[in-house]
């Protein structure tokens, strides 16, 4: 089979490079936004630009990857990231020119400047071309067997976490030079360029990126128009509603949405909780997330590889969601000890649940529609990210640590849906 002939490691390297470039800049994005005239709310809007525009770009790029090939669309996505960092670099080099002073009851007081607009454009452009996640998931589904799928998605998550480990560390080293934050941005530009070169020269095209055609319409130049027409006719039918009608897809994507909703509530509320209730500083918070990333590398790497050969994706999804519920419940007690105990549950829960869910989605979807379905899943996660990022801060302001109980309740919905997902699978002939 073609599955065994293509190495996954070039794709993992491309994913690592993409995450590394992003995590180089995110640690000091808040300081740049404030320096260019923004406030905390504008920072939140800046951070949400990526998922807002990915909401529209992800499904389109996913469908295109079914039609034109995974490699071509991954290349477009990576070029988009490269251009977005160029725009970001321009924002840091141009003078801070004021456009208008804004005093709003909703957005607060801030100054709209030219560099601030450039940063908004950069994050939006990266989002609209941000189909790399959905296309990478579809690519892995093309080249791996069902038996190895969960383990392979775990390795993809490991490459992501490694990027988030090394990126902030490298940013810290580069930003203390005389060039300040501009050097990490230049590094992000160069790293994105390396990603482009790796896709061009090291990543082969997936052998399963288009629909399985009958032999009589493959081959000659005269027949190429028939092939193209057939690809278009089938792919054009795979709109949002058609994908939602596929058996089992809506339930799986609902789980996607709920997981990312709970995650983003956590990632918004926890730093405030750590600063106000645990009395942590930036170094303590950085240590916490570094330990989490290291634990995730272990869980999603060797541990998941071992357990996925012994237990089903459905069992790992269900048990993982239960562990994440325990993580959020422990956070309510606001002690350092229980917070770090909860960290273990977070790593185990996320490490078992997320790769298993991606594996289930890829196995539920026919090969010819992997890109389209993965693209729609990106929209679900983007929408959940937008809602969670906005709601998390407001909820913590009103409910305090009870916000984590709300996140646990959301994940209890994931737990119930995963039980039904397993039952529906058993009922299939």
What are these language model-derived features?
Residues 27-41, 268-284:
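Short amphipathic helix-loop junctions that connect adjacent transmembrane helices
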Residues 1-5, 206-253:
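Juxtamembrane intracellular "pre-TM" segments in multi-pass secondary transporters
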Residues 314-357:
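C-terminal transmembrane helical hairpin of 12-TM major facilitator-type secondary transporters
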Residues 51-59, 131, 164-165, 293-301, ...:
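Residue-level signature of mid-helix packing/kink "hotspots" within the transmembrane helices
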Residues 79-112, 322-334:
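C-terminal ends and interior cores of transmembrane alpha-helices
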Residues 16, 84, 98-131, 338-352:
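Hydrophobic core of transmembrane alpha-helices in multi-pass small-molecule transporters
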Residues 58-69, 299-312, 396:
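Helix-to-loop junctions at the C-terminal end of transmembrane segments
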Residues 120-161:
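Cytoplasmic helix-loop-helix junction between adjacent transmembrane helices
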